[in-house]
Amino acid sequence: MPGIVVHQGEDFESAYRKFKRQVDRNLIVVELRKRRFYEPPSERRKKEKIATRKKILRKLWMLRRYESRL
């Protein structure tokens, strides 16, 4: 959980920027968006399968593109 120490005389804007930077580094907002709605395990597996297929096709495309330049 991100937390910052606000020093005496430090303005709100700089403290807010520090806090926002920590939140961004910890990927809290991304995690919240991902968990906003419940995703059944079957949907999760389906998405992983699609992502894997895209990754393989992308690598194959890059390989063919590289070989055509030789």
UniProtKB/Swiss-Prot annotation:
Gene3D superfamilies: Ribosomal protein S8. Coiled coil: none annotated. GO terms for cellular component: ribonucleoprotein complex; ribosome. GO terms for molecular function: structural constituent of ribosome. GO terms for biological process: translation. Pfam families: Ribosomal_S21. It comes from the Bacteria. Keywords: Ribonucleoprotein, Ribosomal protein. HAMAP family: Ribosomal_bS21. Belongs to the bacterial ribosomal protein bS21 family. This is Small ribosomal subunit protein bS21. It comes from Nautilia profundicola (strain ATCC BAA-1463 / DSM 18972 / AmH).
